[in-house]
Design a protein with these regions (language model features):
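Short helix-loop "hinge" at the ATP-lid/N-box region of the Bergerat-fold HATPase_c
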Residues: 61-62
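Short helix N-cap motif at coil->helix boundaries in the Bergerat
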Residues: 10, 92-100
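Conserved catalytic submotifs in the C-terminal HATPase_c
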Residues: 4-9, 26, 31-41
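Short beta-strand/loop element within the Bergerat-fold HATPase_c
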Residues: 68-80
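Glycine-rich ATP-lid/hinge loop adjacent to the conserved G-boxes
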Residues: 106-116
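Short alpha-helical Gxxx[C/S/T] motif in the catalytic ATP-binding
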Residues: 121, 125
């Protein structure tokens, strides 16, 4: 799997991903919020793959956030690294399952809460982020929601 690398505007990619999920969120009464550091601008990477990571994280947040919940996307830059997080007020993930969610074909949680999906979204997201030289992880607590965070090096064409 290769990256198609070019400079692209990360804040615009975040805005575009939010636009794509806004209607689904609205239908379920889920509030979408976002906060982007104004110092964050163009980065060098594969825009399509980064957008796919954002959409995977937002789609998962929508699946697991109850009606009336909230999803926030934030992005900041520090030490030449862009850090993007997607936080939801969903069901949360048990500590023992937090690494397993990134495995292929793996879905965690209770069997009575069957959710559509292949179990590939987070595995692909990890692959795409790591191809960029970044990291992805989750912080979560059962019953209070999850925050998925990924980092990307801020490299710009010289």
């Amino acid at each position: 799997m290769e990256l198609e690398v070019a400079d692209f505007d990360l804040p615009s990619a975040i805005d575009n991903a939010l636009i794509l999920v806004r209607e689904r969120a609205s239908r379920r009464g889920i509030t979408l919020g976002h906060s982007v550091d104004e110092r964050l601008g163009p980065i060098r990477g594969d825009e399509r793959k980064v957008k796919q990571v954002l959409l995977n994280l937002l789609s998962n947040a929508l699946k697991f956030t109850p009606e009336g919940g909230r999803i926030d996307v934030s992005a900041r830059v520090h030490d030449e690294v862009a850090e993007v997080s997607v936080t939801d007020t969903g069901v949360g993930i048990a500590p023992e399952d937090q690494e397993a969610v990134f495995e292929e074909f793996r879905q965690v949680g209770t069997a009575d809460k069957k959710v559509e999906g292949t179990g590939l979204g987070l595995a692909l997201s990890r692959k795409f982020v790591e191809l960029h030289g970044g990291r992805i992880w989750v912080k979560s607590e059962l019953g209070t929601g999850s925050t998925f965070i990924f980092t990307l090096p801020v490299r710009r064409e010289e």
